[in-house]
């Protein structure tokens, strides 16, 4: 049967945050928009999207591009650093690895003329997430290293010590995912065009670009002079290479120098069997199908070799009515170790309408209709949602 969904109610976001100049510090569960992709029109960041519920974190960040001194306004940067633990459950009741620790960081640099005289700008950055520590319910794995020295190892992406598994001693301690992000933008008077690429890495073979073009390729067009079509996004996501099928690290490196690697198996890990997920949903791109859709009830990602095409657009019908449309054409071939005999494909659609009454300040009313066709997520399905929201201060104190 199909894995049951989590039917419990929960608070999606709850956090405290303070800021001083360009620095912000937050504690709690908060949706974060860190990377180059648009948070509302993109198919989702490959490393850290908002597909899963927000992870409780202690986070320090410079969330907006800030000018680097002595660069005459040409160089800006932003980034963040956080750490916490994943109180994760699978299918709402099972815990395979208890008290898993979590680390995430990012840094981006942008070359841009802040005076607006030069139309081109470029961005380069890196994102890094790690699952580490914890105690596996599998007695063959058991408790994982979790000392402060091990924390330094996972932050730096270093090999594990003598108390780590053989795989982590050969490769790196913990379950790591990294993306190298690149962007180039042309800004005209009434429009802008931006291209971007997220190169997905699972280990050193990916960091050396041995996994080909795996990742997310995107184009974003902004049209400020056309309110009925303000923004258009096209994305191509491919994860079929994965540094080729074989993970050849089990050889004598002294007798046979050279790099092992291959069989990257994105979002999966031998020690952390629920993979790069939180409460059954992918922390990264939703196009690598989340464990909650596994029909056999097994943990992990069973469809991480994909080739997908995504379109998103938004605009305003009037000063008070806006819309958003998303369409994704999906193809999946299973995994490198468990390929599908026949590929699965499907199309996902979303239409979203928002209305703001001119006399009700801060209030917004909306509705969405979505549909999945094909067999990527199991059977075809449709759904809808209604939303009422209020933005602003509950009470202002003077």
Segments the model singles out, each with a brief description of its role:
Residues 2-10, 174-175, 201-209, 302-306, ...:
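Solvent-exposed loop/turn segments connecting transmembrane beta-strands
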Residues 19-23, 65-79, 110-123, 186-192, ...:
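Short loop/turn motifs that connect adjacent beta-strands in outer-membrane beta-barrel proteins
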Residues 245-335:
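C-terminal structural cap/anchor segments
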Residues 119-124, 132-255:
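Long, internal scaffold/assembly segments composed of regular secondary structure
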Residues 33-140:
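Internal, well-ordered domain-core segments that constitute the primary functional module
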Residues 1-2, 43-48, 91-95, 167-170, ...:
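Extracellular loop and loop/strand-boundary signature of outer-membrane beta-barrel proteins
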Residues 57, 380-398:
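Outer-membrane beta-barrel "beta-signal"
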Residues 1-4, 20-22, 29-35, 64, ...:
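Transmembrane beta-strands of outer-membrane beta-barrel pores
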């Amino acid at each position: 049967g199909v894995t049951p969904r989590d039917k419990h109610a929960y608070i999606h976001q709850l956090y405290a945050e303070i800021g001083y100049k360009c620095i912000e510090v937050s504690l709690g569960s908060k949706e974060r928009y860190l990377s180059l992709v648009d948070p509302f029109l993109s198919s989702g960041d490959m490393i850290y999207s908002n597909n899963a519920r927000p992870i409780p974190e202690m986070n320090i960040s410079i969330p907006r591009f800030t000018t680097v001194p002595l660069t005459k306004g040409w160089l800006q940067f932003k980034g963040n650093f956080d750490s916490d633990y994943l109180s994760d459950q699978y299918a709402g009741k099972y815990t395979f690895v208890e008290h898993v620790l979590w680390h995430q960081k990012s840094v981006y640099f942008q070359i841009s003329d802040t005076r607006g005289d030069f139309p081109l700008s470029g961005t380069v950055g890196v994102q890094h997430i790690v699952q580490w520590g914890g105690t596996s319910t599998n007695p063959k794995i058991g408790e994982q290293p979790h000392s402060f020295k091990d924390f330094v190892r996972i932050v730096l992406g270093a090999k594990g010590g003598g108390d780590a598994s053989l795989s982590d001693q050969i490769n790196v301690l913990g379950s790591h995912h990294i993306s190298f992000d690149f962007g180039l933008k042309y800004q005209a008077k009434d429009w802008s065009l931006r291209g971007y690429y997220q190169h997905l890495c699972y280990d050193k073979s990916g960091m050396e670009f041995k996994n080909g073009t795996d990742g997310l390729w995107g184009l974003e067009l902004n049209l400020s002079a056309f309110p009925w079509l303000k923004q258009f996004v096209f994305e191509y996501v491919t994860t079929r290479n994965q540094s080729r099928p074989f993970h050849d690290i089990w050889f004598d490196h002294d007798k046979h120098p050279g790099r092992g690697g291959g069989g990257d198996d994105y979002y999966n890990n031998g020690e952390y069997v629920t993979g790069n997920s939180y409460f059954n949903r992918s922390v990264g791109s939703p196009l690598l199908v989340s464990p909650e859709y596994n029909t056999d009830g097994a943990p992990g990602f069973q469809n991480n070799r994909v080739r997908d095409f995504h379109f998103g657009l938004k605009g305003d019908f009037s000063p008070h009515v806006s819309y958003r449309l998303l369409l994704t054409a999906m193809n999946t071939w299973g995994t490198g170790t468990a390929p599908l005999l026949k590929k699965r494909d499907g199309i996902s659609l979303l239409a979203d309408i928002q209305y703001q009454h001119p006399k009700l300040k801060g209030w917004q009313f909306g509705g969405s209709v979505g549909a999945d066709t094909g067999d990527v997520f199991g059977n075809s399905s449709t759904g809808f949602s209604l939303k009422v929201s209020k933005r602003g201060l509950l009470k202002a104190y003077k």
